[in-house]
Amino acid sequence: MITKTHKVDLGLPEKKKKKKVVKEPETRYSVLNNDDYFADVSPLRATSPSKSVAHGQAPEMPLVKKKKKKKKGVSTLCEEHVEPETTLPARRTEKSPSLRKQVFGHLEFLSGEKKNKKSPLAMSHASGVKTSPDPRQGEEETRVGKKLKKHKKEKKGAQDPTAFSVQDPWFCEAREARDVGDTCSVGKKDEEQAALGQKRKRKSPREHNGKVKKKKKIHQEGDALPGHSKPSRSMESSPRKGSKKKPVKVEAPEYIPISDDPKASAKKKMKSKKKVEQPVIEEPALKRKKKKKRKESGVAGDPWKEETDTDLEVVLEKKGNMDEAHIDQVRRKALQEEIDRESGKTEASETRKWTGTQFGQWDTAGFENEDQKLKFLRLMGGFKNLSPSFSRPASTIARPNMALGKKAADSLQQNLQRDYDRAMSWKYSRGAGLGFSTAPNKIFYIDRNASKSVKLED
């Protein structure tokens, strides 16, 4: 059965050899449609001794047979995926000849060890992979031809592992749809291919930059990663639909690491808090401005109210000074009452009632007896009717001058006596500082008219 199918496939490229010579990249697209590609690549997975021992895999050639038996079923699925995948960039379908040489080298090495009969058959499969296109691919070549011209420069700079790794997610989807068991083998294959890519990264660091850029674009399109093994068909188709919209809005949403998400959310929270705090700070400022405006409008509208406010503020600041003007009379009255009590004003008021006359400030003077007071008042002319103090009514009379108390009168009397004694001593001791001594028993009399000076008359 296998040989017959390959004979049919080999008959097609003889008719369409001219198109293959002109456009080599489209022929590489046939690798996706033929399930022989899986047969060619599978020995790579089988060669690793650690994985074959760990997972209990069978020898290499039985795996090739199993995959060939399932060729028809998988090829139909591949043909269904051909039409949607034509829109993707042509670099997705590239496969460099250097990688093919490695695959053929593995096939020859493995076939030489076990069976020499299988080696020409494997080579025929490889030749079929190179030259066997489906009839649909001839139509797709014309569509993809224009895109290939644009992406020629990217194809030249493309690396072998990149093209191989680009195709891996699509193969995962095709085999997952057919059989869940095959997905594990494809995942192992992808890991081995990634290991080969890491080895070639060290050799060519310049080509690594182009690889990183292509990987970013592929992840933007939403293809399934090799680590995810069991998605359904609906889940496979949904990332492709979303991939067309995602690059427009967000450049690389899948590339964001999980560790950076809390930091980014924290930054967003901090920004939102700052935005929330700014209006809170601005509101008191607006209130202050409004208050200032209200005060200015109040000054312009009601100047009298503002003046009263200033008066109240002055009173609060300077209580003593402002109270002095209002409480002056009260203090004077209190002082007058105290002085009157000490000086005996009560007795004077009684005599005043008895006499029926007002003597002004002399009423406040303190006397030992009433007779002494009356005698003093008569000598001062207090009882004369012509006195202006009597004629004036009590309301019109100003504040009476307070008479001295006993203590003040005694101090005043002592001061006057001292001054008198000093003057008399000066009169007696005139010229004493010049060496003359005064006669102790001599008495002098004060007389203005008598003088010892000589008057010269012209």
UniProtKB/Swiss-Prot annotation:
<feature type="modified residue" description="Phosphothreonine">
    <location>
        <position position="308"/>
    </location>
</feature>
<feature type="cross-link" description="Glycyl lysine isopeptide (Lys-Gly) (interchain with G-Cter in SUMO1); alternate">
    <location>
        <position position="249"/>
    </location>
</feature>
<protein>
    <recommendedName>
        <fullName>Lysine-rich nucleolar protein 1</fullName>
    </recommendedName>
</protein>
<feature type="modified residue" description="Phosphoserine">
    <location>
        <position position="132"/>
    </location>
</feature>
<feature type="cross-link" description="Glycyl lysine isopeptide (Lys-Gly) (interchain with G-Cter in SUMO2)">
    <location>
        <position position="353"/>
    </location>
</feature>
<feature type="compositionally biased region" description="Basic residues">
    <location>
        <begin position="265"/>
        <end position="274"/>
    </location>
</feature>
<feature type="compositionally biased region" description="Basic and acidic residues">
    <location>
        <begin position="173"/>
        <end position="192"/>
    </location>
</feature>
<feature type="compositionally biased region" description="Basic and acidic residues">
    <location>
        <begin position="1"/>
        <end position="14"/>
    </location>
</feature>
<feature type="compositionally biased region" description="Basic residues">
    <location>
        <begin position="145"/>
        <end position="155"/>
    </location>
</feature>
<feature type="cross-link" description="Glycyl lysine isopeptide (Lys-Gly) (interchain with G-Cter in SUMO2)">
    <location>
        <position position="305"/>
    </location>
</feature>
<feature type="cross-link" description="Glycyl lysine isopeptide (Lys-Gly) (interchain with G-Cter in SUMO2); alternate">
    <location>
        <position position="249"/>
    </location>
</feature>
<keyword id="KW-1017">Isopeptide bond</keyword>
<feature type="cross-link" description="Glycyl lysine isopeptide (Lys-Gly) (interchain with G-Cter in SUMO2)">
    <location>
        <position position="101"/>
    </location>
</feature>
<feature type="cross-link" description="Glycyl lysine isopeptide (Lys-Gly) (interchain with G-Cter in SUMO2)">
    <location>
        <position position="130"/>
    </location>
</feature>
<feature type="cross-link" description="Glycyl lysine isopeptide (Lys-Gly) (interchain with G-Cter in SUMO2)">
    <location>
        <position position="275"/>
    </location>
</feature>
<feature type="compositionally biased region" description="Basic and acidic residues">
    <location>
        <begin position="336"/>
        <end position="353"/>
    </location>
</feature>
<feature type="modified residue" description="Phosphoserine">
    <location>
        <position position="111"/>
    </location>
</feature>
<feature type="cross-link" description="Glycyl lysine isopeptide (Lys-Gly) (interchain with G-Cter in SUMO2)">
    <location>
        <position position="319"/>
    </location>
</feature>
<feature type="cross-link" description="Glycyl lysine isopeptide (Lys-Gly) (interchain with G-Cter in SUMO2)">
    <location>
        <position position="375"/>
    </location>
</feature>
<feature type="region of interest" description="Disordered">
    <location>
        <begin position="46"/>
        <end position="305"/>
    </location>
</feature>
<feature type="cross-link" description="Glycyl lysine isopeptide (Lys-Gly) (interchain with G-Cter in SUMO2)">
    <location>
        <position position="407"/>
    </location>
</feature>
<dbReference type="GO" id="GO:0005730">
    <property type="term" value="C:nucleolus"/>
</dbReference>
<keyword id="KW-0832">Ubl conjugation</keyword>
<keyword id="KW-0539">Nucleus</keyword>
<keyword id="KW-0488">Methylation</keyword>
<feature type="cross-link" description="Glycyl lysine isopeptide (Lys-Gly) (interchain with G-Cter in SUMO2)">
    <location>
        <position position="7"/>
    </location>
</feature>
<feature type="cross-link" description="Glycyl lysine isopeptide (Lys-Gly) (interchain with G-Cter in SUMO2)">
    <location>
        <position position="373"/>
    </location>
</feature>
<feature type="compositionally biased region" description="Basic residues">
    <location>
        <begin position="198"/>
        <end position="218"/>
    </location>
</feature>
<feature type="cross-link" description="Glycyl lysine isopeptide (Lys-Gly) (interchain with G-Cter in SUMO2)">
    <location>
        <position position="442"/>
    </location>
</feature>
<feature type="modified residue" description="Omega-N-methylarginine">
    <location>
        <position position="430"/>
    </location>
</feature>
<feature type="modified residue" description="Phosphothreonine">
    <location>
        <position position="310"/>
    </location>
</feature>
<feature type="cross-link" description="Glycyl lysine isopeptide (Lys-Gly) (interchain with G-Cter in SUMO2)">
    <location>
        <position position="287"/>
    </location>
</feature>
<keyword id="KW-0597">Phosphoprotein</keyword>
<feature type="region of interest" description="Interaction with ZNF106">
    <location>
        <begin position="306"/>
        <end position="458"/>
    </location>
</feature>
<feature type="modified residue" description="Phosphoserine">
    <location>
        <position position="50"/>
    </location>
</feature>
<feature type="modified residue" description="Phosphoserine">
    <location>
        <position position="42"/>
    </location>
</feature>
<feature type="region of interest" description="Disordered">
    <location>
        <begin position="1"/>
        <end position="21"/>
    </location>
</feature>
<dbReference type="GO" id="GO:0003723">
    <property type="term" value="F:RNA binding"/>
</dbReference>
<feature type="compositionally biased region" description="Basic residues">
    <location>
        <begin position="64"/>
        <end position="73"/>
    </location>
</feature>
<feature type="region of interest" description="Disordered">
    <location>
        <begin position="336"/>
        <end position="355"/>
    </location>
</feature>
<dbReference type="InterPro" id="IPR028124">
    <property type="entry name" value="SMAP_dom"/>
</dbReference>
<comment type="subunit">
    <text>Interacts with ZNF106.</text>
</comment>
